[in-house]
Amino acid sequence: MKFILATRKSPLALVQTEMVAARLRQKIPGAECDLLKVVTTGDRQAEWSLSKQGGKGLFTAELEQALLRGDAHVAVHSCKDLPGENTPGLIVAGYLPREDVRDVLVLREGVTEPRTIATSSPRRQLQIKQLFPGATFTEIRGNVDTRLRKIAGGLADATILAAAGMNRLGIREWPGVVFRPLKLQESVPAVGQGAIALQCRQETIPLLRDVFDAGTARSVDVERAIQAAVGGGCQIAFAAHVSGDTLHFFHERTGVRTLPLTGADFANPAEAAKRLLGELNFHA
């Protein structure tokens, strides 16, 4: 069978979609893949502040429309770009094996205590402020390599990037900057960070069952259930990450918290979200 994979055009998106294509060919005998390259609203509006615009669906809506029109079988997303709720008629069917989930502090060479940090993410801003209380923040947009060049060129003292994206692009070092991976307690990752999500119509799921990684789904399904229960988009400072049987939770109202998870939580993520938010005394 030939699969049409809808993807953004950025270098990272194309690398991730090629990973999905390779997985399909590996797991499904005779599978062929073509890429449908789509420009999203977030790609077109390169000067927008994502936090002020809300960020919800800015990098996913056009890919979803391609699925709904029948132009593609699968949309390939960075899971952290997806809203918490499913779009009617579509489902996040599964994930590829998860990459390194950590955030990475990118420091301009010679800087140890950054005064200006370029990040548009309220989640990252509020958490990194605990490490560098005197820092101020500025906006930054662009692909991974663009952001690295901007920091090396002096736009700001530092920025924060996802380790997963840099690893997939093969970036281990960059002239003029130094990489410092952040611990989970220093920067709780975004929901789904490090996971590549495969979204499709319901009838496509049986074709893909052998492709998905169960371990990644076990964690990300709980994270996304919490995201849906909390509500909001990129404009709020919120994070949830499942590591083993532990939930790492961050919200501007609670700070960083950790809670144990049970087998029942993984069996019913929606109920788990209610229980966990209740224990945190969090009310959306």
Feature annotation, model-predicted:
Residues A72-V76, D157-A158:
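Short, Asp-centered acidic motifs that coordinate Mg2+ and/or phosphate
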Residues E47-V74:
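Short, structured active-site "lid" loops
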Residues C79-L82, N86-T138, I196:
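A conserved helix-loop-strand patch within extracytoplasmic ligand-binding domains
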Residues G42-E47, A75, P83-N86:
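Short active-site-adjacent helix-start/loop capping segments
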Residues M1-V39, Q45, K52, Q125, ...:
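Small-molecule-sensing regulatory modules
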Residues G70, T112-E113, G154:
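Structured loop/turn residues at beta-strand edges in well-structured enzyme cores
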Residues V74-A75, C79, V242:
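A short, hydrophobic beta-strand-centered structural micro-motif
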